[in-house]
C-alpha cells in the first residue's frame, strides 16, 4: 500500500496558505466599498450579483434604491475611467460637479421626475448653470451643456458616456446620433432584464419584481422605497438581441461589463460590422417555467385578475435542476406527482448546518409551486416516454442490424462510408419534435440564449440611393450635380467638426482670432462697490478699499493668466489656470473654472467675463444676483501710503477669520489682490512678494495664521506660542510686537500694566485684603516653574486669570460671582477677543480666560474636563487657575488636579482652597507609596510564621503585616556613593542591616544597628533607616516599613536581591517594587576602569577616584578574597562570599571565580557587580574557568589595542563643539501647532502619494552570480506587518521587511552580484584626491582613541563582553552578521519598490571593531586636520559653520551627485585605495593585510542563511563612514572639474559642491567604466544634502518635507519608549528651526515644488507632535510576496 498521499508536506501547505492569503489580501485591497445601509437580504443579493468582486460594507448613508445605485456606481466608474474627456448623455444633476472631464452634456427639458431631480441638484459650480436653465427654461449659459437631447445635439466629441439614458432610443437612432456628433465610441449602461423577452405578466426573482404589461416594463428591486424603472419593452428587446447596426452608419455593439442584468455596452462605429454572437445571461440564477393556465388564456370572467398572473415563473436554477434530477432518476413504480410535490417542498426550505448552507431554499407563491409541479411532472413524463420509446426502438434496430447477412454488411462497408461530417448517432432519427408542441418543453433557460441580430440604420437609404443615381445621370448628361444642395453636418477638421477635442483631424483648422490682454491696468477700489456689496463686506473694510488703488500687470499665455498686483509697497502674484484650487476658510473646496477662449471664469456663486476694449479691459461681474461692468484703464496707479495698505490688509484678515468662525461650510478666503484686482474675488496661486520675504508678514494673508488681531494688545497676548516667558519673581515679560507692520508703521502701544494701582475703568481692586500683603501660601513648586498655592487667585501676578465659568459665560455663583464683582466688564461677550472650544478670552478690563468645566452633577465627562484646561493654553504669558469644576459642579478634586497637571504650561499657578489643600498635603507629588495588598500581606505573614519557628527568627513571633499604604524615602546610588555615611545619628533611631558585618560597621560609628529578625523588637514607632534594603527578606522589610514612624531606605537596586535560602517560593512573590526618590551617581570608591565595566548597569556613574586601572588578571592573590559560593569559601581560608561583602569597602581584593559558580554568575550579574565594586586601589581576578569573561569582564580590548601597535598618549578629542541656536529671531513662534491629519493629507496631495495597499513587497529573488549561498530548510515568512503610525500614507520607499525570503533576496540581489574588477594603479586617483585630502603623514593610534571607542560602546549599551582575544582560528573573532534593513528612504516618487531587493546592515565582530576602530579614528582626525577650509567632512563640523559657508557663496550653483548601488559597485580598486591610505598613515602591515583579507573574501551570516562572497562593501563595518566618504571624495575629485569652487561637503555617498560651473574630467571615463560606477549629477540653484536644503546665499536649512515624510514611515510602537524617542527627535529638529522657520517655508517649498502653505502646515504639525499631542493609528497591512525561486550557480 502506498502511503505517500498521506504524508504531510509543510512547505506545500504553507505555500498554498500564503497564496490563498495573498489572494484574499489582493481581493480586499481591490474590493468594492458598499456605503448604504442594507438589509440582510439586500446584502445577499449584492454579494451574488457582484461575484467574483469582493465587497467591503461600510454603511454610512441611506439610499432609496441601494442595490441599483451600487451597481450603477461600479459601472459608472468603469465607463468614466475608459472614456476620458467625453460627451455625456442624460447626466444625473448630482454628478455634474464631480466630473470635470466631461466636455458637453446633453439633456432633455425636464418633465415629471426629472423636475424633482433638478430641484435637488447642487446650487454651486457647473451644476448651478444647468439647474438654472432647466428650471427656468433659459438658454444654456455656455457650450458645456444643452437641452436638445442626444438626437438633436451636434456637439462634436469622439467618445461618449450614457448611464441608463438610452432606454428610449432604438439602436438605429443611436447610430444616427453618434454620426451627428462625430462619435466613434459610446459607453452606455443599460438595464436589460431577461423577463422582457417573455409574455406579459408579473415576474418575481430573488433580486427584483418586474411587471410586464406588453408595452412597458416596471422593475422594482428588493427593499426599494421609491418608484422603480419604467422602460419600453420593444426597445429593451431590441437592445438585448442586437449586436450590430448596418446601413449608412454601421455600429458594433459589444457587452464589455455585466452585473446581473445591468450591462455596459461599448458601441463602436465600424465600417463593416462582423457577426458577434453573444450569450447575455450566462450567470442567470433563474429558470422561467411556463404556466399552462395563465393570462394568455381565459380562466375566468374577470380579465383584470389575469394581469397579475404570469405565463412564466422565475424558479431558481438549483431548485429546477435538483427537481428534474430527482424525477428523472426515480424508479418507474415510485414515480408519481405526490412524490415530486413532497421533494419540492423539502428543497424549498432553507437548511443551515453551522456555517454551511446545506439547502438554499426558495420562497415561492402558490401559483409558482403549481406551475413548477405541473411543468416538471409533464416534462418528466415526456422524458420517460422518450426513454421507453428509445430503448424499444433501439433494441429493434439492434436486432435488425445483427440479423443482417453478409451481402448487406458488404454493401454497408463498400457504399456507406463515414466522412468528416459524420457524427455518431446521427444515423438514428427516431423522433422529431415541433417547437409548438407541448413536448418541446415547459421552461426557458436564459443561460442558453444566444443572440446575433442586426438592425438597419433608420436613414433614408433608398431615397439617397435614387438621388445618387439621378446625380450620376445628370453628370452623364453633362449637367452640374445637385449634391451640393445637401446640408452638411457640422464636423471637425476636414469634416468640419466644431470641437477641437475631436481627435482624428488631418487638416489644420483655421486659427481663431486671439484676445491678448497683456499689459498694466489701474484698479480703483471705488469702481468695485457692487462686487463688495455682493460679497457682503463690512463697511469699514469697503471704506478702506475705496481709498486704495492698485496696478495690475497681466501676462497672458496659452490658457494662463499671470497677474502681478502692486498695492502700495506690497506686491502679490496670482496665476489663473483652469482647475486652480481657490483658498477657502472652511471644509468646502472650490476650483476655478477658467476658459481663456471664452474669456470667462467662475467658481461657486461668482462668475465673470472680460474683453479688451478701447478704454482698457472691460470686466463683467455676476455675483449673487448682482451684475456690474467695470472698465479698467491702462497705466500705473499712484502709490498708496504703506500705513493705509497695512491697515487694509489687517482689516481684511480679521474679516476672513470672523467669517471662518461664524460659517459652518466656510466661504472664499479673500486676499488683498482678490479685492483690488482685475478679476475679483479670485486670487488663485496667491503669493506675496517682498524684498525681505522672511520677515513673517506674508503669513498674515493666508488662512494658516491663527491669531485674531483687533488691537496690538491682542497680538501680544494671544497666540499659539508654546514656551512661556521666564518667570523670576515678578510677572513674566510678554511679547507685544506688531502683527502687521512695516518700516513706516508706528510701534504699537505696550501691554498695559494690570498689576499696579492704576487700572482701567470697570476694574475693581484685585487684592482680597486692604493692606495689600499677599496671604497666599506656597505648597509645591514643579521642575518647570509651575507653583501651587493655597489662597486667593486674585493675589496672583500672572498675566491671565482663569475663571470657572458656565457654558453661556453669564455671571454665576462661587468663584464666577467673585470675578463678576471685581471685573463686571469681563462678561461682555461683545468684547471677547477669541474663543477656543468653550473657553472665551477677554482683555477687558484685564486678561481673563473664562473656562468651562463639565457639570458632574449631570454626567461624568473626563474628556470635557481635560478640554477645559487645554482650551486655556492658547495664550502667551502665564495663567493662574482655580480647580475647575471642583465647586458647584462637584468635580472630584483629584480629577481636576490631575487634569491641570497634564495641561498646564511652565510658570503657571494653581490656587487651592483649604479643603483642597488638605487633600494635596496627603497626596503630595514626589512621595512614593507602597501598597500592601491583602495577598501580599497574607504571603508575608506566612513567611513570618515560618521564620518564627527557627532559632534566628524567634523575635518575629506574633508579628503581623497588615494591608495598607506605606510611605517611604528611598535613596539609591551607585556602589561607594556614600549613602550610608550621609546618615546622621540625630536623624535616626534604629538602623536595620542584612548582615552581621554591616551591623558591626554601623555600631562602630555609634548607631543602634540590628539584623532584620532582631530589629522586630525595636522598630515599632521609631525612625528607621534600612541599609541595603533590596537585599533584605521582603516580609521583614514590609514589617519594619509598616511599624516605623518614618522609614528611609538605602541601597542599590542593581545589586544582589534577597535570596530564598529555604526555597519556600515566598520571597519572589512578596518582593515589593521600590521606587527610588533620589539617585546618587558619583562614587568615591570605584576606580575608572571599574566604572566603565559597570556602566551598562549604571549609565550615569562618575568617580572621584584618581586610579585609572585597578583590574589585573593572573597575578598572585592580594588583600581580601571574594568568592561566590560556600564551597569556594571553605576551599579558600580567609575569604568571604560576595553576598557577605555587600556594603563593605576594601583597599585591595582578589576575586576567585570557581567552576561551581557558573550558574550563579550567569543568572545574576549583580554578584559580579558587587565583587568588582568592593576595592579602592587594586583588584586581582583569578578566572580560570572563564566565568567573568562570559559576562563581559575581560581585558581583551586593552590587549588587542596594544597588539595592533597602539600607544599611550593624547590626541585632540573627536567631539565637535556644538551649541543650541539662541532665540535671536524666534520666527518659529509665529507657527502655531496645526492638525496632524490635515498636514499629512496635504503632503500626500502635493506629492501624489496614496495609502499603500501593502506594507512591503518581497521581490523575486534574482540569480546568484558569484559566491555560495546556504539556505535554510524552512522559508517561513510573516504575511502582515503591524505598525503604530501617524498616518496611513507613507512617503518613504517600502521594501521587504525582516524575514527569510527578504533576507535571501537581499543577500543574492545586492551582495551575490558579480563584481566588476578594475586592475589599475592608484597614483592618479590619489593625486586627484589630494585636492581635498593632502598626503597624510604618520598617524599613531593612542589611548585617547581607545577611550573614545569604549565610550561609544558604552553609549550603545555594550559592555565589551563580545570582545575576544585575537585568535583568527575562532569564527567568533571574524564573524560578519547580516541584518535585513527596512528601507525608509524618503522619496517623492513611487513608495512601493516593486522588483527591487532590500538593503542590508552588517555588523563585524566586536573584536575586529575594537582592533581597527582606534586606528580608523586616528586616521579620521588626521584627515580633518588637513582638510581645506571650504571642505566639510561627514558631520565633523557645527551646523552653523556649514550654513555660514553656504550663505557666503551667494552667486554659486549647487552640484549634487547621487550614487546608485554605492556599496555594491565597490571592488578591488576601492579596497586597494583604502589600503594605500592605511600604509601612507603608517598602520602595521599585518593589520593592513588582515583588513584586505577580510574585505576581499567574506561570509555574511544571517540568522538562518549565509553567503560566501567577494569584494562587496558592507555598510556596517568599522570605518564605514570614513572609507565611504574617502571613496566618494576620490570619485568626485577624479571625475569632475569645478570652476570657482567655494564649498564642498561629503558624507558617505552624499556630496554637494558649490561652484559656478563644472565639467567631466578627461580621465573620468576609464574609472567610471572600469568600476561600473553609476553617477547621477544634478546642477541647480538649490540642492539637497544629508537632510538639509543647501541654498546659496541663505545657508543650510533643515529639510522639513523630508523629515516629515520620514516620520510617516516610523513605527511609534509597540512601547511608549519608542514614541518618546521619536518625540524628542522632533523637538531637536524644531530647535534647529527656531530662527529660520520662515526661510524654510520659502526655500523648501521651491526645491520640492510644493506650496509654501504645505511647509507651514508641516511645521505646525511637528510642533503638535513635539508637544506630545500626536494621534496614532494601528494598522495591519499585508505583504505582497512575489518570490518564486532562488537560482544559483556553482563557482
From Swiss-Prot:
Cited Pfam families: DUF3729 (PF12526), Macro (PF01661), Peptidase_C41 (PF05417), RdRP_2 (PF00978), Viral_helicase1 (PF01443), Vmethyltransf (PF01660)
S-S bridge residues: 434-481
UniProt main location, coarse: host cell
UniProt-annotated binding residues for Zn(2+): 671, 673, 686
Gene Ontology molecular function, alphabetical: ATP binding; cysteine-type peptidase activity; helicase activity; metal ion binding; mRNA methyltransferase activity; RNA binding; RNA-directed RNA polymerase activity
Region (Y-domain): 241-439
Phosphoprotein among keywords: no
Post-translational modification: ORF1 polyprotein does not seem to be processed into distinct enzymatic domains by a viral protease belonging to ORF1, but could be processed by a host serine protease like thrombin.
InterPro entries: (+)RNA_virus_helicase_core_dom, Alphavirus-like_MT_dom, DNA/RNA_pol_sf, Hepatitis-E_Cys-pept, Hepatitis-E_hinge, Hepeviridae_RdRp, Macro_dom, Macro_dom-like
Positions of the UniProt region annotated as Methyltransferase: 60-240
Ranges where the record places region NTPase/helicase: 958-1202
GO cellular component, one term: host cell perinuclear region of cytoplasm
Ranges of residues in domain RdRp catalytic: 1452-1563
Domain of life: Viruses
Region spans: RNA-directed RNA polymerase: 1205-1691
Region (Zinc-binding) residue spans: 510-691
Entry's Gene Ontology BP terms: DNA-templated transcription; methylation; mRNA modification; proteolysis; RNA processing; viral protein processing; viral RNA genome replication
Reaction catalysed by this enzyme: RNA(n) + a ribonucleoside 5'-triphosphate = RNA(n+1) + diphosphate; GTP + S-adenosyl-L-methionine = N(7)-methyl-GTP + S-adenosyl-L-homocysteine
Positions that bind ATP: 973-980
Region Disordered, annotated ranges: 722-778
Similarity remark: Belongs to the hepevirus non-structural polyprotein family.
Domain characteristics, as noted in the entry: Contains a methyltransferase domain, a Y-domain, a putative protease region, a zinc-binding region with similarity to calycins, a proline-rich disordered hypervariable region (HVR), a macro domain (also called X-domain), a helicase domain and an RNA-dependent RNA polymerase domain. Since the boundaries and the activity of the putative protease are not clearly defined, the zinc-binding region might be part of the putative protease.
Function: Methyltransferase: Displays a capping enzyme activity. This function is necessary since all viral RNAs are synthesized in the cytoplasm, and host capping enzymes are restricted to the nucleus. The enzymatic reaction involves a covalent link between 7-methyl-GMP and the methyltransferase, whereas eukaryotic capping enzymes form a covalent complex only with GMP. Methyltransferase catalyzes transfer of a methyl group from S-adenosylmethionine to GTP and GDP to yield m(7)GTP or m(7)GDP. GDP is a better substrate than GTP. Y-domain: Indispensable for virus replication.
Record text on subunit structure and interactions: The protease domain interacts with host EIF2AK4 (via C-terminus); this interaction inhibits dimerization of EIF2AK4 and prevents EIF2AK4-mediated phosphorylation of host EIF2A.
Protein name: Non-structural polyprotein pORF1
Amino acid at each position: 500500500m502506498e502511503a505517500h498521499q498521506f504524508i504531510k508536506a509543510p512547505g506545500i501547505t504553507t505555500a498554498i496558505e500564503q497564496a490563498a492569503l495573498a489572494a484574499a489580501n489582493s481581493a480586499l485591497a481591490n474590493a468594492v466599498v458598499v456605503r448604504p445601509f442594507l438589509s440582510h437580504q439586500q446584502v445577499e443579493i449584492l454579494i451574488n450579483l457582484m461575484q467574483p468582486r469582493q465587497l467591503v460594507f461600510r454603511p454610512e448613508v441611506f439610499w432609496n434604491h441601494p442595490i441599483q445605485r451600487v451597481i450603477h456606481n461600479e459601472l459608472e466608474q468603469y465607463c468614466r475611467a475608459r472614456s476620458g474627456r467625453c460627451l455625456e448623455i442624460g447626466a444625473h444633476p448630482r454628478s455634474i460637479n464631480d466630473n470635470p472631464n466631461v466636455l458637453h452634456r446633453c439633456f432633455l427639458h425636464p418633465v415629471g421626475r426629472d423636475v424633482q431631480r433638478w430641484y435637488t441638484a447642487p446650487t454651486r459650480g457647473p451644476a448651478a448653470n444647468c439647474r438654472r436653465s432647466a428650471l427656468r427654461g433659459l438658454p444654456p449659459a455656455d457650450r458645456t451643456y444643452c437641452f436638445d437631447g442626444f438626437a438633436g445635439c451636434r456637439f462634436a466629441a469622439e467618445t461618449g458616456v450614457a448611464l441608463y439614458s438610452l432606454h428610449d432610443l432604438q439602436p438605429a437612432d443611436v447610430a444616427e446620433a453618434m454620426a451627428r456628433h462625430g462619435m466613434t465610441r459610446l459607453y452606455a449602461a443599460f438595464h436589460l432584464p431577461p423577463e422582457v423577452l417573455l409574455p406579459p405578466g408579473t415576474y418575481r426573482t430573488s433580486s427584483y419584481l418586474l411587471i410586464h404589461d406588453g408595452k412597458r416594463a416596471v422593475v422594482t428591486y428588493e427593499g426599494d422605497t421609491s418608484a422603480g424603472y419604467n422602460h419600453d419593452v420593444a426597445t429593451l428587446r431590441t437592445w438585448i438581441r442586437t449586436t450590430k447596426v448596418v446601413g449608412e452608419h454601421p455600429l458594433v455593439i459589444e457587452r464589455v461589463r455585466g452585473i446581473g442584468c445591468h450591462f455596459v455596452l461599448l458601441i463602436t462605429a465600424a465600417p463593416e460590422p462582423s457577426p458577434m454572437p453573444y450569450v447575455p445571461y450566462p450567470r442567470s440564477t433563474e429558470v422561467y417555467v411556463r404556466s399552462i393556465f395563465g393570462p394568455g388564456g381565459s380562466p375566468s370572467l374577470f380579465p383584470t385578475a389575469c394581469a397579475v398572473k404570469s405565463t412564466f415563473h422565475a424558479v431558481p436554477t438549483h431548485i429546477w435542476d435538483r427537481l428534474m434530477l430527482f424525477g428523472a432518476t426515480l424508479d418507474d413504480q415510485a414515480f408519481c406527482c405526490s412524490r415530486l410535490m413532497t421533494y419540492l417542498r423539502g428543497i424549498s426550505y432553507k437548511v443551515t448546518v453551522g456555517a454551511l448552507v446545506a439547502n438554499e431554499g426558495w420562497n415561492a407563491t402558490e401559483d409558482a409551486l403549481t406551475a413548477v409541479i405541473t411543468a416538471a411532472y409533464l416534462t418528466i413524463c415526456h422524458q420517460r416516454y422518450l426513454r421507453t420509446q428509445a430503448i424499444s426502438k433501439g433494441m429493434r434496430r439492434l436486432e435488425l442490424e445483427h440479423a443482417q447477412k453478409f451481402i448487406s454488411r458488404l454493401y454497408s462497408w463498400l457504399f456507406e462510408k463515414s466522412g468528416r461530417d459524420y457524427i455518431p448517432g446521427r444515423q438514428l432519427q427516431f423522433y422529431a419534435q415541433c417547437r409548438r408542441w407541448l413536448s418541446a418543453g415547459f421552461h426557458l433557460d436564459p443561460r442558453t440564449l444566444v443572440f446575433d441580430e442586426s438592425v438597419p440604420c433608420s436613414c433614408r437609404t433608398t431615397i439617397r440611393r435614387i438621388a445618387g443615381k439621378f446625380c450620376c445621370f445628370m453628370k452623364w448628361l453633362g449637367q452640374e450635380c445637385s449634391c451640393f444642395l445637401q446640408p452638411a453636418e457640422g464636423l471637425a477638421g476636414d469634416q468640419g467638426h466644431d470641437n477641437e477635442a475631436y481627435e482624428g483631424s488631418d487638416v489644420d483648422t483655421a486659427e481663431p482670432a486671439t484676445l491678448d490682454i497683456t499689459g498694466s491696468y489701474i484698479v480703483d477700489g471705488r469702481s468695485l462697490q457692487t462686487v463688495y456689496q455682493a460679497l457682503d463686506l463690512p463697511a469699514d473694510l469697503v471704506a478702506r478699499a475705496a481709498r486704495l488703488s492698485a496696478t495690475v500687470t497681466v501676462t497672458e499665455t496659452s490658457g494662463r493668466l499671470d497677474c502681478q498686483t502692486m498695492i502700495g509697497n506690497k506686491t502679490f502674484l496670482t496665476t489663473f489656470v483652469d482647475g486652480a484650487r481657490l483658498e477657502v476658510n472652511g471644509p468646502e473646496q472650490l476650483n476655478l473654472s477658467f476658459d481663456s477662449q471664452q474669456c470667462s471664469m467662475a467658481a461657486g456663486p461668482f462668475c465673470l467675463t472680460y474683453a479688451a476694449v478701447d478704454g482698457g479691459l472691460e470686466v463683467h461681474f455676476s455675483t449673487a444676483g448682482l451684475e456690474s461692468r467695470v472698465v479698467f484703464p491702462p497705466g500705473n496707479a499712484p502709490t498708496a501710503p504703506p500705513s493705509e495698505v497695512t491697515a487694509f490688509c489687517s482689516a481684511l484678515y480679521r474679516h476672513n477669520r470672523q467669517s471662518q468662525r461664524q460659517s459652518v461650510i466656510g466661504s472664499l478666503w479673500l486676499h488683498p489682490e482678490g479685492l483690488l484686482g482685475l478679476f475679483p474675488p479670485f486670487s488663485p496661486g496667491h503669493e506675496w512678494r517682498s524684498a525681505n520675504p522672511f520677515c513673517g508678514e506674508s503669513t498674515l494673508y493666508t488662512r494658516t495664521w491663527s491669531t485674531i488681531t483687533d488691537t496690538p494688545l491682542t497680538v501680544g497676548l494671544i497666540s499659539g506660542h508654546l514656551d512661556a516667558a521666564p518667570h523670576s519673581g515678578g510677572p513674566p515679560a510678554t511679547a507685544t510686537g506688531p502683527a502687521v507692520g512695516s518700516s513706516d508703521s508706528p510701534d504699537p502701544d505696550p501691554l498695559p500694566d494690570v498689576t499696579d494701582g492704576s487700572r482701567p475703568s470697570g476694574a475693581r481692586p484685585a487684592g482680597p485684603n486692604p493692606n495689600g500683603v499677599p496671604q497666599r501660601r506656597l505648597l509645591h513648586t514643579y521642575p518647570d516653574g509651575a507653583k501651587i498655592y493655597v489662597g486667593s487667585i486674585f493675589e496672583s501676578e500672572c498675566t491671565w486669570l482663569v475663571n470657572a465659568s458656565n457654558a453661556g459665560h453669564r455671571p454665576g455663583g462661587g468663584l464666577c460671582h467673585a470675578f463678576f464683582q471685581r471685573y463686571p466688564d469681563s462678561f461682555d461677550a461683545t468684547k471677547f477677543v477669541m474663543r477656543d472650544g468653550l473657553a472665551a478670552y477677554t482683555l477687558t478690563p484685564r486678561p481673563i480666560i473664562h473656562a468651562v468645566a463639565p457639570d458632574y452633577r449631570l454626567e461624568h465627562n473626563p474628556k470635557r474636563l481635560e478640554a477645559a484646561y487645554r482650551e486655556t493654553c492658547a495664550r502667551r504669558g502665564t495663567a493662574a487657575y482655580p480647580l475647575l469644576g471642583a465647586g458647584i459642579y462637584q468635580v472630584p478634586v483629584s480629577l481636576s488636579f490631575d487634569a491641570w497637571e497634564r495641561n498646564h504650561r511652565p510658570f503657571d499657578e494653581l490656587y487651592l482652597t483649604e479643603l483642597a489643600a488638605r487633600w494635596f498635603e496627603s497626596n503630595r507629588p514626589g512621595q512614593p507609596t507602597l501598597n500592601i495588598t491583602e495577598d501580599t500581606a497574607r504571603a508575608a505573614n506566612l513567611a513570618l510564621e515560618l521564620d518564627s519557628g527557627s532559632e534566628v527568627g524567634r523575635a518575629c513571633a506574633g508579628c503581623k503585616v497588615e494591608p495598607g499604604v506605606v510611605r517611604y524615602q528611598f535613596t539609591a546610588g551607585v556602589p561607594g556613593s556614600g549613602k550610608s555615611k550621609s546618615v546622621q545619628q540625630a536623624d535616626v533611631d534604629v538602623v536595620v542591616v542584612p548582615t552581621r558585618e554591616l551591623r558591626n560597621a554601623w555600631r562602630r560609628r555609634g548607631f543602634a544597628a540590628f539584623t532584620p529578625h532582631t530589629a522586630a523588637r525595636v522598630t515599632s514607632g521609631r525612625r528607621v533607616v534600612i541599609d541595603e534594603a533590596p537585599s533584605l527578606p521582603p516580609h521583614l522589610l514590609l514589617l519594619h516599613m509598616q511599624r516605623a514612624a518614618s522609614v528611609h531606605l538605602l541601597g542599590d537596586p542593581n545589586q544582589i536581591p534577597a535570596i530564598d535560602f529555604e526555597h519556600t517560593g515566598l520571597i519572589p512573590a512578596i518582593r515589593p517594587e521600590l521606587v527610588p526618590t533620589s539617585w546618587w551617581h558619583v562614587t568615591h570608591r570605584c576606580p575608572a576602569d571599574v566604572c566603565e565595566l559597570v556602566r551598562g548597569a549604571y549609565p550615569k556613574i562618575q568617580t572621584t577616584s584618581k586610579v585609572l586601572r585597578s583590574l589585573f588578571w593572573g597575578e598572585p592573590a592580594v588583600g581580601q578574597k571574594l568568592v561566590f559560593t560556600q564551597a569556594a569559601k571553605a576551599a579558600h581560608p580567609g575569604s568571604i562570599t560576595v553576598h557577605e561583602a555587600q556594603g563593605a569597602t576594601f583597599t585591595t581584593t582578589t576575586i576567585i571565580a570557581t567552576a561551581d559558580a557558573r550558574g550563579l554568575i550567569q543568572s545574576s550579574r549583580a554578584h559580579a557587580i558587587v565583587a568588582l565594586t568592593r576595592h579602592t586601589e587594586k583588584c586581582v581576578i583569578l578566572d580560570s574557568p572563564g566565568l567573568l569573561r562570559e559576562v563581559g569582564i575581560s581585558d581583551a580590548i586593552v590587549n588587542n589595542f596594544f597588539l595592533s601597535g597602539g600607544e599611550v598618549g593624547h590626541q585632540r578629542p573627536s567631539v565637535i563643539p556644538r551649541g543650541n541656536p539662541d532665540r535671536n529671531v524666534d520666527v518659529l513662534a509665529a507657527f502655531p501647532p496645526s492638525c496632524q491629519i490635515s498636514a499629512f493629507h496635504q503632503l500626500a496631495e502635493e506629492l501624489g502619494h496614496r495609502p499603500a495597499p501593502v506594507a512591503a513587497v518581497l521581490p523575486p529573488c534574482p540569480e546568484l552570480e558569484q559566491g555560495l549561498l546556504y539556505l535554510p530548510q524552512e522559508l517561513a515568512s510573516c504575511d502582515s506587518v503591524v505598525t503604530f503610525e501617524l498616518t496611513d500614507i507613507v512617503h518613504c520607499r517600502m521594501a521587504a521587511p525582516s524575514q527569510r525570503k527578504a533576507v535571501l533576496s537581499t543577500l543574492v540581489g545586492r551582495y551575490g552580484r558579480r563584481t566588476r574588477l578594475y586592475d589599475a594603479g592608484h597614483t592618479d586617483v590619489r593625486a586627484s584626491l589630494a585636492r581635498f585630502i593632502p598626503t597624510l603623514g604618520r598617524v599613531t593610534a593612542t589611548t585617547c582613541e581607545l577611550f573614545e571607542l569604549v565610550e561609544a560602546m558604552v553609549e550603545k549599551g555594550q559592555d565589551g563582553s563580545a570582545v575576544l582575544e585575537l585568535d583568527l582560528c575562532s569564527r567568533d573573532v571574524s564573524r560578519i552578521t547580516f541584518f535585513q534593513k527596512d528601507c525608509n528612504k524618503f522619496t517623492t516618487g513611487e513608495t512601493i519598490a516593486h522588483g527591487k531587493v532590500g538593503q542590508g546592515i552588517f555588523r563585524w565582530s566586536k573584536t575586529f571593531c575594537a582592533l581597527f576602530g582606534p586606528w580608523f579614528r586616528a586616521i579620521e582626525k588626521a584627515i580633518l586636520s588637513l582638510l581645506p577650509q571650504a571642505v566639510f567632512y561627514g558631520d565633523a563640523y557645527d551646523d552653523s559653520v556649514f550654513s555660514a559657508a553656504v550663505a557666503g557663496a551667494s552667486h554659486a550653483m549647487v552640484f549634487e551627485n547621487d550614487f546608485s548601488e554605492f556599496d555594491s559597485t565597490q571592488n578591488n580598486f576601492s579596497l586597494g585605495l583604502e589600503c594605500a591610505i592605511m600604509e601612507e598613515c603608517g598602520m602595521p602591515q599585518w593589520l593592513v593585510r588582515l583588513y584586505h583579507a577580510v574585505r576581499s573574501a567574506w561570509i555574511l551570516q544571517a540568522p538562518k542563511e549565509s553567503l560566501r562572497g567577494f569584494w562587496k562593501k558592507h555598510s556596517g563595518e568599522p570605518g564605514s563612514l570614513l572609507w565611504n566618504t574617502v571613496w566618494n571624495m576620490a570619485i568626485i575629485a577624479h571625475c569632475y572639474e569645478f570652476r570657482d569652487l567655494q564649498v564642498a561637503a561629503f558624507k558617505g555617498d552624499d556630496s554637494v559642491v558649490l561652484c559656478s560651473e563644472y565639467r567631466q574630467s578627461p580621465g573620468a571615463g576609464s574609472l567610471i567604466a572600469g568600476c561600473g560606477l553609476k553617477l547621477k549629477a544634478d546642477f541647480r540653484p538649490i540642492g539637497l544634502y544629508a537632510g538639509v536644503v543647501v541654498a546659496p546665499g541663505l545657508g543650510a536649512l533643515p529639510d522639513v518635507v523630508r523629515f516629515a515624510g520620514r516620520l510617516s514611515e516610523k513605527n511609534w510602537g509597540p512601547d511608549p519608549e519608542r514614541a518618546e524617542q521619536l518625540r524628542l527627535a522632533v523637538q531637536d529638529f524644531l530647535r534647529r528651526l527656531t530662527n529660520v522657520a520662515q526661510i524654510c517655508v520659502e526655500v523648501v517649498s521651491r526645491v520640492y515644488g510644493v506650496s509654501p502653505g504645505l511647509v507651514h502646515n508641516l511645521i505646525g504639525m511637528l510642533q503638535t507632535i513635539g508637544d506630545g499631542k500626536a494621534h496614532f493609528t494601528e494598522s495591519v497591512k499585508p505583504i505582497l510576496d512575489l518570490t518564486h525561486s532562488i537560482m544559483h550557480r556553482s563557482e
